[in-house]
Amino acid sequence: MKMTQMYMPTLREIPNEAVVESHKLLLRAGMIRNLANGLFAYLPLGLKAFRKVEKIIREEMDAIGCLEFKPPVIVPGEIWQESGRWDSMGPELLRIKNRLNQELVVSPTAEEAFTALLKNELSSYKNYPLLTYQINTKYRDEIRPRYGLMRTREFTMKDAYSFHTNDKSLDEAYLSFEKAYIKIFKRCGLTVIGVKADSGAMGGSGSQEFMVESSVGDDTLLLCPSCGYAANEEKAACAPDKEQGNGNMPQGSALSIEEIDTPNVKTIEDLTAFLKTESSSFIKTLIYRVENSEILGNAENGKKAAKNENKTVLIAVCIRGDLEVNEAKLKSSLKASDAILASDTEVEEATGTIVGFAGPVGLKNIPVIADESVMLMHDAVTGALKKDKHLLHVEPSRDFTPAHVFDLRTVRAGDKCAVCGTALYTKKGNELGHIFKLGYKYTKAMNMTYLDENGKQQHPSMGCYGIGLDRLTASIVEEHHDEDGIIWPMSIAPFQVAIVPIKYEGEMQKEADRLYEECKKRGIEALLDDRKERTGVKFKDMDLIGIPIRLVVGEKNLPNIEFKLRKAVESSLVDKDKVVDLVEKTVKEELAKLN
């Protein structure tokens, strides 16, 4: 390609709306432009890099026997109603109607589409396992798109789905995708961290995310420096604490409950100051509104959960006072679509008192769900279910019995690793890929069945495996850039070599054209800068757009050509008859490093 044929509207100034480096550089390099908030267009150079990412993903999917499909982006709303996600997805799901007043969905993901497409086709155990994928446009009505390609409303995803008749087959597919993802990210030149993760609204289990470190990352990662344990904050676990008392009183010396006056003492901070003791001595009780829980309804011990026709349940969540509830863990533990703090009015209706004085002792209207930390406490302090009153000397199990006990705490830096006991540390990260075992969530909801070897109807299990191509492309720029511009890995670069004559005339033009034609003959992707521009402008543009190799044709250096790697500081002079050999060798070596 010649520069005079290329559309490359580079910018010298950083656009005001750009915050992260990838957004700044992709805009300045003339690779993307935004039409509206969260809606981006790829320009020719950016699209060439994007297509390289797409090609790598296709090659690795094909290598594990995964078959590409092309379902529609707009799908019937009824299949989302069938799966149960029509309501649970919330306002991020873009719902539209056609002229026949039929409900449609602009797909944010494709579990429903693939299940509906294949449910009547995979009717025998002989049809399994089947590995499928799509690379398609998606839409999610994000409340706050930001950071350029990192979080958009319209985006491109590789979604893969596997269908199985047994757990062993699903486990094998999961491992195949895990290995394929590691290859994909390596070939793209990315350093990723595999972390245990929550499946969220997708459902299922056996979940792993592939993250890149980022100062503006959406996720907090908990990492162990000793054993390599890594998890998203939403999923992270830690070693249990020792038994927690008040003043180190031994368990055997438990005292009877005592009610005390605590006028206007509503928060843990207030209580700490009032009682002059540590917050770890308190049992914090929070009232949550839980939606569509699969395990809540009529609670244990004769207590009926406060429930309405919208499948909404009020519960009390108890946790040690110095800890915070992890709402992702809460939703996952209760198999619920959502869990949010109740309103002040709901708290009063459920507990009979105002916010700040709830507690588990004597709570009759709603079930108590406890974090594991609570069951290791004794001689604790809780709200007394009365305004301006608290209880002392509370003993879990003796004074109240939770309906369920789960790991609900938010793990923090300094907590002990659940595997080896070493203190964990945190990093911010962005998710590039996610793999997880869906199980029967969609096949049961949408009644997908097959006949097994005995002629009995069964539901197949599913795996789900996603990669965001736009975020992946932006993440490559985040990891590979300097103050002058992008430094594309050889595997992703729009072109592998840039040929830059000081002036496109005379002997310099002749030699530049010869090098260009020779590169093309050898299958080397070359960009010839044939513009009538100043040398400084040409060099600035080439540094900005990040082509890995630059050949400079100057009259003073002929018959030698200046050879420079974009990632290197120094350049060298190479005989014009040998320089294409060096380019070819370098391209092969750089690609080999990424394989």
From Swiss-Prot:
Its EC number is 6.1.1.15. Pfam families: HGTP_anticodon, tRNA-synt_2b, tRNA_edit. Belongs to the class-II aminoacyl-tRNA synthetase family. ProS type 1 subfamily. Catalyzes the attachment of proline to tRNA(Pro) in a two-step reaction: proline is first activated by ATP to form Pro-AMP and then transferred to the acceptor end of tRNA(Pro). As ProRS can inadvertently accommodate and process non-cognate amino acids such as alanine and cysteine, to avoid such errors it has two additional distinct editing activities against alanine. One activity is designated as 'pretransfer' editing and involves the tRNA(Pro)-independent hydrolysis of activated Ala-AMP. It comes from Treponema denticola (strain ATCC 35405 / DSM 14222 / CIP 103919 / JCM 8153 / KCTC 15104). The gene is proS. It is found in: Cytoplasm. Gene3D superfamilies: Anticodon-binding domain, Bira Bifunctional Protein, Domain 2. Keywords: Aminoacyl-tRNA synthetase, ATP-binding, Cytoplasm, Ligase, Nucleotide-binding, Protein biosynthesis. This is Proline--tRNA ligase. PROSITE patterns: AA_TRNA_LIGASE_II (PS50862). GO terms for cellular component: cytosol.
